[in-house]
Amino acid sequence: METVTICASINEKKKAEFFQTMESLTGLVESQCNDLDIRVKDDNSLIIKITFAGKDQMEKNFYTGEFNILKGSVKSLCENVIIKVNESLLNNN
């Protein structure tokens, strides 16, 4: 099991755009992983947990397509973005 965790703070001015983007991407991302959990707290803090069956599934999907759009959207619409794979900080956030 491989788990990717994305933590960030949603920019208040871009909150509506963030939710629209997540709504359009969720189904596509869910089809390429075992589980997708997106949580937003009242203070606009965001935690996205993406679980893959194994390293092969993660490498096949997380570095291409919809996941690149997801990561790019989070990076452009949020602040203080941290991406971890199995609790290890991912290089080149």
Where are the language model's segments positioned?
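Short S/T/G/P-rich N-terminal loop/turn motif that feeds into the first structured element of a domain
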Residues: M1-I47, T51-Y63, V81-N93
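A short hydrophobic/aromatic micro-motif that marks alpha-helical segments and, especially, helix-coil
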Residues: T26, I69-L70
